[in-house]
């Protein structure tokens, strides 16, 4: 078996340093999506550290390009913050608590819950509606790993799309569906 030698410059393309993290929320304002509307659906701050080289939608703004089917992000959540209930139908989403405590809710109405403490992890099965929320008093960090080929499969209930439209306008709801991985189609056949 022959190995390859990429040298320091080649390896530098694969190293993601903390100074190179960029929140992806602000990237959508030019596409008609106010930061506040994006944050209504997601964690307060999301840093995509690694995404497939062909990434689109919500994974197009990344610190480094990686293998197909793998995205790694950090969700930084102030107290009480986290995404709304959503589902992934084709990708596994794995949460690993780095700092703080997170309530994990699942079920179509978030009727089930458990708590992730520091270094706890959960692999949420395909098709299960889920959300997490920082239940601590300080900003908390959650490592988010997404595995699977179609990473544009983030679904929210239609009622969530209606909430976005009521608060920010139908054009913002439509821009979210057009320019991110998020759709308001959970519960649709």
Tell me what each language-model feature is:
Residues 1-69, 174-189:
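A short, N-terminal "cap"/entry segment at the start of jelly-roll beta-barrel domains
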Residues 2-8, 131-189:
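Double-stranded beta-helix
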Residues 51-60, 73-88:
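Conserved short histidine dyad/triad with adjacent acidic residue
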Residues 74, 87, 106-108, 134, ...:
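Residue-level recognition of conserved beta-strand positions in structured domain cores
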Residues 75, 95, 122:
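Conserved GNAT-family N-acetyltransferase fold
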Residues 78-80, 116-136, 145-147:
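Conserved metal-binding segment of the jelly-roll/cupin
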Residues 82-85, 90-118, 128:
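A short beta-strand-loop-beta hairpin characteristic of the jelly-roll/cupin
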């Amino acid at each position: 078996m022959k190995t390859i030698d990429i040298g320091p410059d080649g390896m530098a393309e694969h190293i993601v340093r903390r100074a190179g993290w960029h929140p992806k929320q602000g990237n959508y304002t030019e596409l008609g999506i106010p930061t506040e509307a994006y944050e209504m659906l997601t964690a307060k701050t999301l840093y995509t550290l690694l995404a497939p080289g062909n990434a689109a939608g919500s994974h197009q703004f990344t610190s480094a390009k990686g293998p197909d089917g793998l995205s790694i992000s950090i969700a930084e959540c102030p107290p009480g913050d986290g995404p709304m209930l959503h589902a992934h139908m084709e990708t596994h989403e794995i949460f690993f608590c780095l700092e703080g405590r997170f309530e994990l809710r699942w079920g179509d109405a978030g009727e089930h819950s458990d708590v992730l403490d520091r270094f706890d992890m959960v692999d949420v099965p395909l098709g299960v509606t889920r959300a997490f929320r920082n239940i601590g008093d300080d900003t908390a960090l959650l490592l988010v790993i997404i595995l699977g080929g179609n990473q544009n499969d983030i679904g929210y209930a239609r009622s969530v799309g209606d909430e976005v439209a009521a608060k920010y306008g139908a054009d913002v709801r439509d821009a979210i569906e057009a320019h991110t991985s998020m759709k308001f189609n959970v519960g649709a056949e």
